């Protein structure tokens, strides 16, 4: 796996982690609508990371 591939994976993993932290904070503040949006964002980030990992490991 190239350096660029690792960078892309690290960025996707970072977004996944940050979206989870944001979700926790939004829940603490009882911002339900925003927490719902953030939960979808986190789920998308998980799928993105998993998809990138699978694709880049094939190459």
What does each model-found stretch correspond to?
Residues 3, 11-59:
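Short, charge-rich amphipathic interface segments used for partner binding and complex assembly
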